[in-house]
Amino acid sequence: NEEISLTFAIVKNKVVLTDIVRQEEGNPLLELFSLLRDDIKNQTNTFLNYIVRNRSNIQDGIGYEIIPRAMFNQRLIDEFNSDTFHKNIDHFRITAYTNKAVSDWNSIVRNSIVGKDADIIHINDLVLSYNTIVDEFKEPIILNSEDYILEDIRPYISDEGIKTFAVNLKSMYDGHITQPFLIVDTKDASFLKYKEILTHLYNRAANRVQHGWYVYYKFKNRFLTNLKFSIETIQGTKWINKDIDYGYSMTVHKTQGSTFDNVAIDLTDIVFQNTRFGRRENDIDIRNKLMYVALSRARKSVIMKY
């Protein structure tokens, strides 16, 4: 019952979208999208009921399937270690609802590639930016939500005695190689020194010392971190968000706008949440929308753990 916007009513040159772009006609995923759209509209569980009864509809790599946890894990490892993925990073991606699940999947995949005891970063690591970092001339070094491959890496101790890695990243969007910047080795004891300096500079700024915030951000933006951490300030606990992370898995929210050939979905993480009272279902409206976004990222196929 909305009124038609004049923008669409009187404009001469306009485009009407009538064709499916991501998935080819006949892809079984299209039927799932239809079920989910109805579920979103009516707050129902038709999609979940359907896939429980029809656990697989895939042929020639097109469609969907639900597989057990052990098989799901091995499938992820196989896909990310395949020649196909190395030639095309949009071949495969994992998505989940919570940051914890994303972190867990990233660890499983990366450990299978470089081993559990490897440094926090490694040549050819796939990383995803969680922040836009600019240089002193306000030119972006890395862009939020962009994929990068670790092109070059050199161990480096900063003037403050912080163990870091001096790295160059290659953008998977345009092939641009970034200027060198520093990633803090969060496994090293000197990470505590980094946090101490950051806390000190934050407190100076909070106390309104002249140019305090400028100094704080100048220091902070010299270093990138790959995990979220807290510092204890005069204003209480402050959480510092990570700048980058491994890019094999990402939250459903982070995938919006992206398309991958094949997507692995931790459906259990979307449908349920763990509480102190046990496992409970997430809000039906939220989970239906999340499931729709997650499934619709795939061009060819989806595998689900549920």
Where are these regions (language model features)?
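C-terminal accessory regions
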Residues: 163-306
